[in-house]
Design a protein with these regions (language model features):
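Short acidic/glycine-rich loops and adjacent helix/strand connectors
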Residues: 1-185
Length: 185
């Protein structure tokens, strides 16, 4: 994904970010790693990995998929397609404060924890406001995690260009905010 994003961009150099539910990448030593969040530096006809987060450390894509299906009862894929976008739409109408700390505690890594889907599913079924607030908390935690990681590496590897790839960057609300987070994108 990093190569596709960079080499199809027409940039001579760029910081490249991939965020998804899981992909195969190579670490700096050439070992295959299942990853969910990577940052690369592209220059000329080469890209090199700068930062790789393995699937067991962070997985925002799986967080969205599991919450979409287990809390909101929507499709996470086949046969109806992934309806995480519907949850993202709910997020803009909610207040993240009530559930933010709970999602922040798990830091986008809910598949390896004792995340309480049943409690949140019950709350979501009680009112539209709760559905919107839960979605807003997911959205805010996603944005905060992505922003903090990208900004850290953007300072270390400055570039006027940013290439994005992966399912999580299809989060249009978050991607739109990236224009506020970074100058000259």
């Amino acid at each position: 994904r990093a190569a596709n994003a960079f080499f199809s961009s027409n940039f001579d150099e760029a910081l490249i970010v991939t965020i998804d539910g899981g992909g195969r990448d190579y670490d700096k030593n050439g070992n295959v790693v299942i990853t969910t969040f990577t940052i690369w530096k592209g220059e000329g006809n080469k890209i090199k990995p700068i930062m790789i987060i393995p699937i067991e450390k962070l997985n925002l894509g799986v967080m969205w998929q599991l919450c979409t299906t287990n809390i909101f009862g929507l499709s996470g894929g086949y046969p109806k397609g992934n309806q995480a976008g519907s949850v993202m739409a709910m997020a803009v109408m909610g207040d993240p404060s009530e559930h933010y700390e709970y999602f922040k505690t798990y830091g986008g890594n809910i598949q390896h924890t004792n995340f309480d889907f049943a409690r949140l599913q019950k709350l979501a079924s009680e009112s539209e406001e709760q559905r919107f607030n839960i979605a807003a908390a997911m959205q805010k935690v996603t944005e905060d995690i992505v922003r903090s990681i990208i900004l850290k590496y953007a300072k270390q590897y400055p570039s006027k260009n940013l290439c994005l790839a992966g399912g999580v960057v299809l989060n249009s609300v978050m991607s739109g905010k990236m224009f506020d987070w970074f100058k000259d994108i």
